Each structure stands twice: as C-alpha cells, then as structure tokens.
C-alpha cells in the first residue's frame, strides 16, 4: 500500500491580496515569499483530504496559466473532491458534487470556470486566424456591421461576452468566490471576473414594479466580463434589465445548491433557469432544454433534494460525486455538547446569561486562534458581542439586517486577523473559509442537522483541527414528566404535530441523539471547567504574519482587561465618594426634615393654643353678653314690679292677640291690603326708639324695638312676648281693636318719633284716605265712617272724662291725643307713658287720659 500524501492547505484568503482586488498586483512579493516558505513547510492533516496516489494538479490536464495560479496559491496536490470533480467538470458533463466543508469545493468550480473561458478563448483565436486568411470585401462589410464586443472578438480573439454564471446564496459567499477566482487567475490574461451583489448603493432606487434599478457602475462592470458571480436577486435584476446576455452562457454553477433550492430562493432560481433556457433554445442539445452545462456543489444534500436537482440537469450526462453522504462532519473537529437545565425558567434571559457565563469560561480555557459563535436571534448576538467586548475580547457581530458595507468590513476584519471572535447568525454558516478559526460555539441549537454540519464546518478547514461546542436546553425532571403525560394524551388525540412544537426540551436532546444514531457523529458531553486537550484544536499557523497578528490581539486584550479594571476601580472610588456625599446629603436632609417637623408641630401646638384661647375668649364674651342681657331683663322686670301706681298690671299672652287678630281678619277679608299683624292698614314703621330722627309719618316697614339702636328691628331681648298693661278699673279696654276709641290701649301699635309726636296706625294722620280706610276696616264702629275729625272729637271727650292731671298736659301741650308727646318719652304701655324729661317732676309713670 502506498504512503498517503499530505496536502497543502487551501486558503488563498490568507494572503494580503485576498481582501481587495486592487491590492493583488501590489502583493506579488508577499505571495512569492509565502510560496517559498510553504515549500519548506509541512504539517499533519486529517485523512478526509488525503489520497493514496501521488498525483498533482499538473496531471489533471489544466491550462498552464491555471496551474501557475494554483501553485502560487499553495495548491500542489488535489483533495479527493478536487481529484474527482475537476476532470469531470472540464469534460463538460453536468455534475452534482457533495463533499465535506473545507475540502476545496470552491477551487473545483473555480478551476472549471477558468478552463471553460480559456477553452472558448482558444477556439476564438483559432477562428480569428482562419478569418484573417480569408478576408474579402464581403467579410469587411460584415465587420463594419458588428458591435464592439463581436468586432474585438473577431479581430483580436478576446472574448468579451459572459460565459460562466456562478450563483451563491449570500453576498459574503459571492465575494469570497470572486476573491478565490481572482487569486488563481492572475496569470490568465484578459479574463475578467466580477461580483454583483445588492446593498452597496446608497439609494435603493426602484421602478414602478418595485424592481431594483441598476446603477451605471454595475452596467460598466458587465462590459467584457466572462465570469459573473452574484446572488439570485441581483442576477435576476441584470437579466430583467437586459444587461446580462444569457444566449452566450456556456456554464451555470450553483454553490450551496441545497440552500438555493429551498423556499427562500427556489422561485428566483426557477425564473433564472427559464430565462437561460429561452436564450439558448437554438442550442437544444440536451433534455434540459438548453446547451448550458449545470454544476451543483454543497456539503449536504437532503434525500428529496437530489431528485429535485436532477430536473435542472442533463440526465444523459449527469454525474454524481458524493464523498460524504454518510458522515458529513470533518474528522479534525472534536464535537462537544453542554446541557443547561431549566429548572424554573424556559428559554428566557436568565438562561441566556448562564450560557454567556459558560461561554466566557470556554474562551478562557481554550487557546484558540479565532472563534465563531452562532446565535439564532439577532438581539442575543448583539448583547453577547457587547458583553465580550467589555470582557476585553476583540469581537464583532454580523447579521443579515446590517448594512452591506458593514458586513463586508466585518468579514475583512476576520480574514485579516483584526478580531478574534465573530458572533453571527446563520448568515456565515455556509461557505465562509477562514483557516485560523479553530473554535465554533453554537449558543443556540440550529434548526436542522444540515445547518449544524455547516456551522461546525467553519473550523477544521482543509484537514486542520478544531473544536465545536453546542449549548442545549433541557427541562427539569418534573417538567419532563409533565410533558410525557401531555405527549401521551396528544398521541391518543392524534395531535403529534402540536406535541413536537410544544416539546422544545426533548427536541434539543433528541437532536443530539439523532446526530449520534443517523450520522455516526462522535460527540461528547461536557460541563463547566472541563479541560479540552490542546492537541484537539492546536496547530501551527502556516503564515508567519498570523503569529504576529495573534500576539498583537492578545496584547490588546490584556491592555483592555487592565484598562477595564482601572475603570472599575475608578468607578468604585467614584461610587464610594458619591455614596459618602449622598449619605452626608441624606443626613443634612434628615436634619432639615427633623427641624421642619419640630417647627411644624410647634406651630400646630401654638395654633391649637390660640384656638383654645379664642374659644375661651368667645365663650367669655358670650357669657358676658348673656349676663348683660339678663341684667337688662332683670332691670326691666324690676321697673315693672316697682310701679307706684295702684293699677294692676298683667301680661297678655300672644294667644289673646292672635285671637283678636283672627277675629279682625275674618271680619275684614276684603280690606287686607297693606295690613300689619293686627289688621292695621299701614305702610309706616313701628318706631319705638325715642332718639329716631326721621320725618313725621315715615313708613319703611321696619320695627325698632330697642331704645338705643336706630333703624333696626330689635325688640328687647330681655322681654318675653308683648307686654300689655291693662287698667282693670277702667273700662277703656275694649274686646275688639276698633271698638277702642283710644288706640293707645294697644302698646304694640304705638309709633314714636323724634319730633315730639307719636302716631298710631289706625289714626295715621289727617288724610281723608287713611281715615276712610280705618273706618271701613272697623266693622263694629259705624259712627267712624265719616271722617277723621269725628274720631278726634270722640277721643277728646273720652280723654276729658279720665283726665286726672291737667297740669301735665299744660306743660307738654294741650293735645290729649298724643300728637305732641315730647322727645323724652322712653317707654309706654297702654294708658301710661314714662317721662324722662327734666321738666317732669315725678320721673315716673303718668297716666295718659
């Protein structure tokens, strides 16, 4: 048995020329140095890229320009997929190729594409030399009618039409394919390869049909391009806008074909395939309807997809190469899984934080070069990136929703060794080739097994070694038992689909079991602080510049960690100072609060005391007023009781007055306008204050009952009821008011004025109208119906009969009817008045007759 040949690494992206096309010509010296270093460099690689025979690329019948480009890129001997697929692809057959990630599939279809262009160019040159020997006037006329590209092809022998179309599922893969082809075609003269992807224009202009409008830069780059690389959406736009000719295509290559044929891309791929078939209808030499060679490459092919893919192929010339259909994982990858038990929570932020803590422990334990961490959610990826950067790890994040320029910049930083960790969604789970990545961590479990193999395939590239760790969630035993009961119940109800959706904990652990059973994967469980042997992932870096870059990144990380510690200490000191100041402020505030509290309570106490004092003061004054009122009442009673006259006094109750009023009102219902309480037709005031200075006969309907207050209705508060003084020895008290010719018998109707006269309601004045009203209201007195003069005569006669003091009337006036009563009268009752004038010698009650 022949010795196995160890192959060189297939990573043209390591050179400085891989990042930018413009730098390719300036990096020839670096490539030559790298080539010389590589000749003396050898390292152990895995068996899945080894072949038994000692075969080189020169034995694969390749053009010398391609061979020279492969040699400069470090490719001396082919891998198994390269050895089998390149010769078949060059021969022109349709090809379905399956190989493990990182075994050199990009080199396979890159070489096949270059060979196709070189072959067509060679045929064109032969045809051009033949045309030169047969030039005629007719051919000269045809040359004038040719377009620019056809004229150049005919006269110079250079193809300026698209020959190869390469479709990739993501923009990052498309850019990488273009870089690989550029690196191995630098010795191929007049071959142009361009990549067309979306997201680079600052203004995403669209037409009325919501289709992308190509800018002039894309159109200019299409001129003279033989190999076109792009994403499905961009390729469709080029064809729709009639910028990409499909009638000249000779070959269509689908990288990551299983991804291109899933639901997200299948509609666009079918549209492109139909457009290519219509453009080549005149070359119908295959069952597929076109003369185009179809090639498909991927690391994984589901069983149903193979039959679907054959519909795009020429079945007569179809060849399948499936080198890893049973075990798609690479031999150089050591696979681990770590369980996170959700005893109380389920896929929440707490579980995410626990995973982040375990992740940091892994990064500290494993001496990795570069690492890729996959997340299922963009938000989690962004949060993880922030945490790792705070820990000092040079980390970047990439996802589909980002700006395309930022995505390209992030990939450039990863490939140029400017970062150590890249956090990503499934955007870069396929096709991305970075040799220095020797650690892959699945923070979240992928959705299917194919994605799992593509994720871990980012390490262990082309026979190198690496480690993959997958974090899975597992529910507690109690939750498992509950789910088992639910599962049995759902099976009885034939709801297996709902059971699969609700049983996330079992899905993740079953995912690992299926990897072991169906794909024979060697995967080991681990826990925190488990040591991962260095020989499982460590290897010597091929490029000396990588060693220096790694050392710089580690130094930067240490500086960042030191800076973070200093910032934390500074922050702690600031927090202590702030806490100290805060405590002092709180103490001051507390003192102020206590001070205000004491003042407030003191003020409240003072207010309460003031209220009590006011209350006592009011009560004291109220008592004094009551005592004063009581004293006045007692004085009044004393005056009544000590009267020197022999007449008897009594108080007539209000009921007597009310009875009298009732009797009067019932007999005078027709004359009740402007009547007082006792039926008197008046508009005057009851003035009982001798000091009232008003006009005679003034009327305001006010009752002045206190001798010391003007213009107020105040009856003395000490008097109880209306006092009536009756002379029992005199028959002057009549049973009815209008039977009394002397109205002074009713005290309540007295009117006192300040002009030495009094006025009675029933004898108002000498006005005839008032006399008539009084005569009409008196039902019992028929003699008073004439006029006021007759009433006055009667009063004079009655008064003369009872006159016992003629001297008094001579002193105060000769009017016996009270019209000239002096101003000094203070109080009167019935037939008596009390005089306080200095001319009165008795100063006592005097009978008024």
UniProtKB/Swiss-Prot annotation:
Q: Extract the CDD domains matched here.
A: SF2_C_DEAD
Which family, according to UniProt?
A: Belongs to the DEAD box helicase family. DDX20 subfamily.
Q: What is its EC number?
A: 3.6.4.13
Q: Which UniProt keywords apply?
A: ATP-binding, Cytoplasm, Helicase, Hydrolase, mRNA processing, mRNA splicing, Nucleotide-binding, Nucleus
* Chain span(s) of sequence motif DEAD box: 255-258
Q: Where in the cell is it found?
A: Cytoplasm; Nucleus
| GO annotation, cellular component aspect | nucleus; SMN complex
Broad class of where this protein is predominantly found: cytoplasm
- What name goes with this protein? Probable ATP-dependent RNA helicase ddx20
Q: What's the stated role of this polypeptide? A: The SMN complex catalyzes the assembly of small nuclear ribonucleoproteins (snRNPs), the building blocks of the spliceosome, and thereby plays an important role in the splicing of cellular pre-mRNAs. Most spliceosomal snRNPs contain a common set of Sm proteins SNRPB, SNRPD1, SNRPD2, SNRPD3, SNRPE, SNRPF and SNRPG that assemble in a heptameric protein ring on the Sm site of the small nuclear RNA to form the core snRNP (Sm core).
- What does the annotation say about its assembly with partners? Part of the core SMN complex.
Region (Disordered) location: 9-39, 480-504, 572-644, 667-737, 761-817
Gene name as annotated: ddx20
A single GO molecular function, which one? Answer: ATP hydrolysis activity
Motif stretch (Q motif):
55-83
What GO biological process term is on the record, naming one? Answer: spliceosomal snRNP assembly
Here the segments flagged for biased composition (Low complexity) are: 667-687, 696-720
Residue span(s) of domain Helicase ATP-binding:
86-319
Q: Which InterPro entries match?
A: DEAD/DEAH_box_helicase_dom, Helicase_ATP-bd, Helicase_C-like, P-loop_NTPase, RNA-helicase_DEAD-box_CS, RNA_helicase_DEAD_Q_motif
Q: Which residues bind ATP?
A: 77, 82, 99-107
The protein's enzyme class: hydrolase
Quoted from the entry, the domain comment is: The Q motif is unique to and characteristic of the DEAD box family of RNA helicases and controls ATP binding and hydrolysis.
Its catalytic activity? ATP + H2O = ADP + phosphate + H(+)
The Helicase C-terminal domain sits at 355-499
């Amino acid at each position: 048995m022949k010795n196995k040949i160890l192959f060189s690494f297939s990573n043209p992206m390591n050179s400085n020329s891989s990042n930018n096309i413009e730098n390719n010509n300036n990096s020839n010296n670096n490539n030559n140095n790298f080539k010389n270093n590589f000749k003396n460099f050898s390292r152990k690689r895995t068996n899945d890229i080894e072949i038994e025979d000692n075969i080189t690329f020169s034995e694969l019948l390749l053009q010398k320009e391609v061979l020279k480009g492969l040699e400069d890129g470090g490719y001396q001997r082919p891998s198994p997929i390269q050895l089998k697929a390149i010769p078949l692809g060059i021969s022109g057959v349709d090809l379905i190729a399956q190989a493990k990630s990182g075994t050199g599939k990009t080199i396979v279809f890159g070489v096949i594409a270059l060979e196709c262009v070189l072959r067509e160019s060679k045929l064109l040159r032969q045809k051009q030399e033949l045309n030169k020997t047969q030039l005629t006037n007719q051919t000269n006329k045809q040359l004038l009618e040719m377009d620019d590209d056809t004229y150049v092809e005919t006269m110079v022998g250079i193809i300026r039409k698209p020959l190869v179309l390469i479709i990739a599922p993501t923009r990052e893969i498309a850019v990488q394919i273009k870089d690989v082809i550029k690196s191995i075609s630098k010795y191929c003269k007049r071959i142009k390869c361009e990549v067309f992807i979306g997201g680079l224009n600052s203004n995403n202009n669209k037409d009325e049909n919501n289709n992308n409008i190509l800018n002039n830069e894309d159109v200019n780059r299409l001129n003279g391009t033989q190999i076109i690389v792009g994403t499905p959406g961009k390729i469709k736009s080029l064809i729709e806008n009639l910028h990409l000719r499909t009638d000249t295509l000779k070959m269509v290559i689908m990288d990551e074909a299983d991804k291109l044929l899933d639901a997200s891309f299948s509609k666009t791929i079918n549209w492109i395939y139909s457009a290519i078939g219509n453009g080549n209808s005149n070359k119908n030499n295959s069952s597929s309807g076109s003369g185009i060679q179809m090639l498909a490459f991927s690391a994984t092919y589901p069983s149903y997809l193979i039959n679907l893919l054959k519909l795009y192929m020429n079945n007569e010339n179809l060849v399948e190469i499936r080198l890893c259909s049973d075990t798609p994982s690479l031999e150089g990858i050591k696979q681990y899984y770590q369980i996170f038990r959700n005893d109380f929570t389920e896929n929440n932020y707490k579980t995410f934080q626990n995973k982040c803590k375990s992740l940091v422990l892994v990064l500290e334990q494993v001496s990795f070069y570069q690492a890729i961490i996959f997340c299922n959610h963009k938000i989690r990826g962004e949060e993880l990136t922030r945490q790792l950067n705070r820990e000092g790890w040079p980390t970047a994040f990439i996802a589909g929703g980002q700006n395309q320029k930022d995505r390209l910049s992030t990939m450039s930083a990863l490939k140029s060794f400017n970062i150590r960790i890249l956090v990503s969604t499934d955007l870069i789970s396929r096709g991305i080739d970075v040799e220095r990545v020797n650690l892959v961590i699945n923070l979240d479990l992928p959705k299917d097994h194919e994605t799992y193999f593509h994720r871990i395939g980012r390490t262990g590239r082309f026979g190198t070694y690496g480690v993959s760790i997958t974090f899975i969630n597992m529910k507690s035993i109690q939750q498992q038992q509950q789910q088992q009961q639910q599962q049995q119940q759902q099976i009885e109800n034939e709801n297996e689909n709902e059971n699969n959706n609700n049983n996330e904990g079992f899905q993740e652990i079953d995912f690992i079991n299926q990897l072991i059973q169906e794909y024979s994967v060697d995967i080991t469980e681990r826990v925190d602080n488990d040591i991962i042997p260095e020989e499982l992932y460590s290897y010597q870096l091929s490029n000396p510049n990588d060693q220096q870059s790694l050392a710089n990144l580690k130094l930067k990380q240490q500086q960042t960690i030191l800076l973070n510690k200093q910032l934390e200490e500074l922050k702690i000191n600031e927090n202590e100072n702030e806490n100290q100041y805060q405590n002092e402020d709180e103490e001051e505030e507390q003192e102020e609060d206590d001070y205000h509290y004491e003042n407030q309570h003191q003020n409240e106490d003072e207010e309460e005391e003031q209220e009590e004092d006011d209350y006592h003061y009011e009560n004291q004054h109220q008592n004094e007023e009551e005592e004063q009122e009581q004293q006045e009442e007692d004085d009044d009673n004393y005056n009544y009781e000590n009267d020197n006259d022999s007449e008897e006094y009594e108080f007539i109750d209000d009921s007597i007055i009310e009875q009298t009023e009732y009797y009067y009102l019932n007999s005078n219902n027709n004359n009740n306008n402007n009547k007082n309480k006792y039926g008197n037709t008046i508009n005057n005031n009851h003035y009982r204050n001798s000091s009232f200075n008003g006009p005679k006969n003034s009327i305001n309907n006010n009752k002045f009952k206190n001798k010391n207050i003007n213009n107020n209705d105040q009856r003395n508060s000490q008097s109880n009821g209306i006092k009536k003084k009756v002379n029992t020895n005199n028959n002057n008290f009549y049973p009815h008011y209008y039977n009394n010719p002397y109205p002074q018998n009713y005290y309540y109707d007295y009117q006192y004025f300040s002009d030495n006269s009094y006025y009675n309601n029933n004898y108002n004045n000498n006005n005839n109208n008032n006399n008539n009203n009084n005569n009409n209201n008196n039902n019992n007195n028929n003699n008073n119906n004439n006029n006021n003069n007759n009433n006055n005569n009667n009063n004079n006669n009655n008064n003369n009969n009872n006159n016992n003091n003629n001297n008094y009337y001579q002193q105060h006036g000769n009017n016996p009817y009270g019209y000239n009563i002096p101003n000094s009268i203070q109080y009167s009752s019935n037939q008596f008045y009390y005089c306080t004038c200095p001319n009165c010698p008795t100063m006592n009650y005097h009978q008024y007759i």
